[in-house]
C-alpha cells in the first residue's frame, strides 16, 4: 500500500512539472509584442509571463472596453503561433515589468 501511495505521489509531483513557456514561445511573444509597439497603436510594452499569459501595457483612458481589446490580441496572438492561456491589459502608468512577471491592476482580460 505504501508503494502505491508513494508511486502516485511521485507521478503527481513529476507529472505536473513546470508549465513555463519555452524559449521558442518567448521569442514569438517578443516578436509579436514588438510588432504591436512598432505599429504605434497605443501599446507600449509587453511580456509573456512564466504562467503563460501575455501582458500588454497601454495608456489607459476611461470608457474603453479593454476586455474587447484583450480578446482581439488573444485571437491574433494565437494565429501568430503563440500558445498562451490568455491576455491581460495593464495601464502603463501603474505597472512594473520583470523577467517573466508584471505587476499592476489588470484593466482588461481574455482567456483561451
Regions found by a protein language model. Give the residues of each.
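Polar/charged, Gly/Pro-rich intrinsically disordered segments
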Residues: 21-67, 82-112
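Long, well-ordered alpha-helical scaffolding segments within enzyme catalytic domains
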Residues: 69-78
